């Protein structure tokens, strides 16, 4: 229910990546492949050398903050008995693929989306300060 407004508002704070940028390449690969675990996406983008992981993670973080990529699921490695173990690997995709294009492009301005979310926060958290609401919407 709240994703369209969240996405609309966040994308207004984080503009679409510039043409030819690494962020745009990441989005293009995800659009072509559908969804990939982080490790596969990193390799597909050529970030395979030493110290490349943290640089790549910074690009992913910016795209996630802007609502351009989301975690669809977590994939767990299997042991020799076929049982899941360890930490899950994030399966990344675009929200357009996961929720549909309409859910990412509502028929209202980013400011209207912000106001809707602010009203909801004020309803469910009535005793919080304006500073808290601002932090939640940041």
What are the functions of these language-model segments?
Residues 1-138:
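Long, low-complexity intrinsically disordered regions
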